[in-house]
Amino acid sequence: MKRDITQLLSPELSQSSSRNDKKRKPTNSNKKVQTVLNFPSSSPNASQSTTCPTCGMTYYSHVSKDNDVHNKYHFNFINGIPWPTSFCNNVLERFIVVDHTTGKAKGTSKSKKSQAASKETLVMTIDRRASKQVKRVEEILKVVNGELNAASDGKAWQKDHKGPIQGRAFIVVIDGRAIGICTTEPIQDVDQQCRWIIHRTQALVPNQVNRSIKLGISRIWIAPKWRRYGLARRLLDIVLVHSVYGIVLDKKEIGFSQPSFSGGLLAKSFNGVTHKSGEILIPVYLEE
């Protein structure tokens, strides 16, 4: 029986029962929850939370502090997370991206002509021994997982692995902000991990092992402002070149983990193959 790929690639704990059990003793939890006291308000919706349709953050719009937190998170989500110059010590490639922006003249309803600005773009890896860099990558991944509605990754990019292929975190930086990320994971057990999915249905192909995969793409993400510039595809090409010292990986040696709809389109264009049935297959792997 076919199952959804997200169930197979990113299993989650089943939800606990919502039934009230008066005999059950309350348990302690270390999870921090923001609490807002519900005082009477002239606004009928004052006690209701708001979820931003763009960044996905849930907050209380009538609370000034919540608004400030949301505004900061929203800006970083759209434009990228701050990335200090001191973190840019392992730059792999530099290139130019032409940023097309439109503005509106003050006092008029007419839009200005598109203005193009050349932006130097850096792609780098992090120093895993630098705790501040590791922490910043973890912050970025929280944003990524939040948008993808994905569980936390296996942190393979932080670990040392046997063999020539290591997990890495590749960062794309423009104007001092991390606007893209790709984390990778070396395959440990081909038979247990490597599969194919049907792009149209996202169902696993039964009883098939993809023995070509050597490196998994755990997460790949570009900040919304910088999408449709071809950066995700370019980032994958850089991963091929810089994942194994002295060797350029082939596209068929790359597998994807839990691809979202947009991620599935990226994977399809990058290394999808057409089966004799006419279905397009995407190489995937199961995260350990």
From Swiss-Prot:
Stretches with biased composition (Polar residues):
27-50
Localisation per UniProt entry: Nucleus
Gene Ontology biological process terms in this record? mitotic sister chromatid cohesion
Q: Supply the alphabetized keyword list.
A: Acyltransferase, Cell cycle, Metal-binding, Nucleus, Transferase, Zinc, Zinc-finger
Instruction: Give start-end positions of each zinc finger (CCHH-type).
Output: 50-74
A GO CC annotation recorded here is: chromatin
Feature: compositional bias, Low complexity: 7-18
- What general EC class does the enzyme of this chain belong to? transferase
What Enzyme Commission number does this protein have?
2.3.1.-
* Organism domain of life: Eukaryota
Family matches, as Pfam families? Acetyltransf_13 (PF13880), zf-C2H2_3 (PF13878)
Question: What are the boundaries of the region Disordered?
Answer: 1-50
The protein's GO terms of the molecular function aspect are: protein-lysine-acetyltransferase activity; zinc ion binding
Task: State the Gene3D superfamilies in the record.
Answer: 3.40.630.30
Say which family it is in: Belongs to the acetyltransferase family. ECO subfamily.
Q: What does this protein do?
A: Probable acetyltransferase required for the establishment of sister chromatid cohesion and couple the processes of cohesion and DNA replication to ensure that only sister chromatids become paired together. In contrast to the structural cohesins, the deposition and establishment factors are required only during S phase. Acts by acetylating the cohesin complex component SMC3.
**Name of the protein this chain belongs to:** N-acetyltransferase ECO1
This chain's source organism reads Debaryomyces hansenii (strain ATCC 36239 / CBS 767 / BCRC 21394 / JCM 1990 / NBRC 0083 / IGC 2968) (Yeast)
Q: Gene of origin?
A: ECO1
